[in-house]
Amino acid sequence: MRSLPELLHRTLFRTMSLLSPKGQGVILRRYFDWWHRSPDPWKLSSDGYEQHKYRSTLENLPARPYVRIMEVGCSEGVFTETLAKTYPEAEITGVDVSERALERARSRMPDAGRVRFLRADILTHRAEPRYDLVFCSETLYYLGRHDRLRRASDQLSRLLGPGGVLVAVHPWPEAVRLHRFLDAHASLSRLTERVYTAPPRPFAVTVYGAR
């Protein structure tokens, strides 16, 4: 059962999704710029739970070379840095709505010429279907209503090149709702799903392949 703060959190973002996609994007950018007024607001670089989630995410990937990688909702680039170390030959793009977060991400990796950070909104961003691997972690619940989740699923699927892999990581059992349009998408097939139930918060790592 969700806690009261989680319920209020979800209600807030569901209300935001009553706006147009563009209007919702403006509010989300302002919200996350405010949230990043102090560095690493979620303690992603030091929290044991977050580090466990990163390791678990990588453990579920199909073993293959990945040349072009995108992380949607990269925040300050903590997981992006891990990806750059794990795949030293890959071109990596980190995407977030908060320019303040991206400034810190660029400062974290100032010499990583093959890593770039881009301010963009997954609901409106247009990119070539060129990525071998796309990550979307702890992001979809900010989008609110089902029509926005459906739109995000379409957008995520379009990022993948032939044979590309999409990894979605979200709280369990909320992931069932958040991933439903990915599960049903005509251009995606679910490859694996693993649920981690250790405290403080269960989560699911769901891996999809481009058809």
Can you say where each PLM-predicted feature lies in the sequence?
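Conserved SAM-binding loop of SAM-dependent methyltransferases across substrates and taxa
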Residues: E76-Y87
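Conserved SAM/SAH-binding beta-strand->alpha-helix loop
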Residues: S98-R100
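A short acidic, Gly/Pro-enriched loop at the edge of an enzyme's catalytic core
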Residues: R126-V134
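Conserved SAM-binding strand-loop segment of SAM-dependent methyltransferases
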Residues: D111-L123
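Conserved class I S-adenosyl-L-methionine
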Residues: R2-L61
